[in-house]
């Protein structure tokens, strides 16, 4: 009986070409494993395609709820945004994919896991760090780094290789973007996006929605309810977090919400350009941020922003299965204890407009914040505070004046 390799399989061009390549260069049975994290109709026809390409078996692991509850929600609660723009759509999906690949490898008694990430990208790092953390004894095969046997250097080469092995491709891969999709987002790279000087062809590339210019002229309002930092209802209707994201994707896409054109710094050192659509996620993150502004005290909110940035870096770099991520998440969980309330928003041509926020744990006190005189705050108290708060500035100014006088 042959040993087995588990291939992280999407049915796209790269992983389709890898199946015959593995059979040619390794004496393994190829078991494909597709992890369903909400990519929708991209799963159609996968089993037939995998077997026609030479795989012995295909697993489709449906883990959308697990992905959202255990990976997306911690990022939402942390306010994790990479380089001020990227909501980590691809990054946060990689650890759950690595985890499921390892589980299938153990079930099949496989000796190796293979992935189709290129040698220039982030995903090779994310997949392999996850696999090493969970199953250090498993061999990892990365075809794009196998220079002696992987001779394909472009999508065109892969297309010709597939044709030579009698594999019919269900798409025109030579004229398509490189995309990654899950419930949280879809990314687009390649074609005109390779040159940052080019404007994105939004009419051609957008999948989840429209550009703001083509959004309706009438705004639409919604409300989101949170409990301990987690969304639990949309417009008053109780729903799972995954269902809320799905609904918000439709609403946000309709109004051109969450489209970013970004040049980001990859883990491997180079810059890359892509267009990302995250309509539902953008709405959810904005609502969560607005609720926190009402509830968290100044010191905690300030520290949490720093932790959120670090959390984003850790997730982006593929370090999910580390003590550092666990420690950061533990801090975040404490901050979310009272992040409960309702946020009202209006969507209009790419904009998310605040319409009011309420919480039983709000620290906003109108009697204190109002410009009118109240019992809880005496305007004259500010004088002593300012004298103490500005004491160091006053002392330095006095010293500098003394220095200048003695010159």
Curated annotation (Swiss-Prot):
Q: Which UniProt keywords apply?
A: Amino-acid biosynthesis, Arginine biosynthesis, ATP-binding, Cytoplasm, Ligase, Nucleotide-binding
What does the entry give for GO biological process? argininosuccinate metabolic process; L-arginine biosynthetic process; urea cycle
State where it is primarily located: cytoplasm
Query: What molecular functions are annotated in GO for this chain?
Result: argininosuccinate synthase activity; ATP binding
Q: Name one GO cellular component term.
A: cytoplasm
Leading EC class: ligase
Entry keyword Membrane: no
Domain of life of the organism encoding this protein: Bacteria
Chain residues that bind L-aspartate: 118, 122-123
The pathway this protein participates in, as annotated, is: Amino-acid biosynthesis; L-arginine biosynthesis; L-arginine from L-ornithine and carbamoyl phosphate: step 2/3
Q: According to its UniProt record, which reaction does this protein catalyse?
A: L-citrulline + L-aspartate + ATP = 2-(N(omega)-L-arginino)succinate + AMP + diphosphate + H(+)
Write out the residues that bind ATP.
Answer: 8-16, 116
| Localization in the cell | Cytoplasm
Identify the HAMAP family for this entry: Arg_succ_synth_type1 (MF_00005)
Instruction: Please give the subunit comment from the record.
Output: Homotetramer.
- Describe the family membership recorded for this protein in Swiss-Prot or TrEMBL: Belongs to the argininosuccinate synthase family. Type 1 subfamily.
NCBIfam families the record matches:
argG, PRK00509.1
The name of this protein is Argininosuccinate synthase
Q: Which organism is it from?
A: Lachnoclostridium phytofermentans (strain ATCC 700394 / DSM 18823 / ISDg) (Clostridium phytofermentans)
Organism lineage:
Bacteria, Bacillati, Bacillota, Clostridia, Lachnospirales
């Amino acid at each position: 009986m042959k040993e087995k390799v588990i291939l992280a399989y999407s049915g796209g061009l790269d992983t389709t070409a890898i199946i015959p390549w593995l059979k040619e260069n390794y004496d393994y049975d190829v078991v494909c494993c597709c992890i369903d994290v909400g990519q929708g109709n991209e799963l159609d026809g996968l089993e037939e395609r995998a077997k026609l390409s030479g795989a012995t078996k295909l697993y489709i692991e449906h883990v959308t709820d697990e992905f959202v509850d255990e990976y997306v929600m911690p990022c939402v609660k942390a306010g994790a945004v990479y380089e001020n723009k990227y909501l980590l759509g691809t990054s946060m999906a990689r650890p759950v994919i690595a985890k499921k690949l390892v589980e299938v490898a153990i079930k099949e008694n496989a000796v190796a896991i293979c992935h189709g990430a290129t040698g220039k990208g982030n995903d090779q790092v994310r997949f392999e760090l996850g696999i090493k953390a969970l199953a250090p004894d498993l061999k990892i095969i990365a075809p794009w780094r196998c220079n002696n046997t992987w001779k394909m250097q472009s999508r065109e080469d892969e297309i010709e290789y597939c044709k030579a092995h009698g594999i019919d491709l269900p798409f025109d891969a030579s004229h398509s973007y490189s995309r990654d999709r899950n419930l949280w987002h879809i990314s687009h790279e390649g074609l005109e996006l390779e040159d940052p000087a080019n404007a994105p062809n939004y009419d051609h590339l957008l999948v989840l929605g429209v550009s703001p210019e083509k959004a309706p002229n009438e705004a639409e309002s919604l409300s989101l309810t949170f409990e301990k930092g987690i969304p639990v209802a949309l417009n008053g209707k109780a729903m799972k977090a995954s269902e809320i994201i799905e609904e918000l994707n439709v609403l946000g896409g309709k109004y051109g919400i969450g489209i970013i054109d970004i040049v980001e710094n990859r883990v491997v050192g180079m810059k890359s350009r892509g267009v990302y659509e995250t309509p539902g996620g953008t709405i959810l993150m904005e609502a969560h941020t607005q609720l926190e502004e009402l509830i968290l005290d100044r010191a905690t909110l300030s520290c949490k922003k720093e932790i959120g940035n670090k959390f984003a870096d850790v997730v982006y770099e593929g370090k999910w299965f580390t003590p550092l991520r666990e420690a950061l998440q533990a801090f975040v969980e404490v901050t979310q204890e009272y992040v409960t309330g309702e946020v009202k928003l209006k969507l209009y041509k790419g904009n998310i407009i605040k319409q009011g926020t309420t919480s039983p744990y709000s620290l906003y006190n109108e009697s204190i914040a109002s410009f009118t005189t109240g019992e809880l705050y005496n305007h004259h108290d500010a004088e002593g505070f300012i004298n103490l708060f500005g004491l160091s500035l006053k002392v330095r100014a006095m010293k500098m004046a003394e220095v200048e006088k003695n010159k």
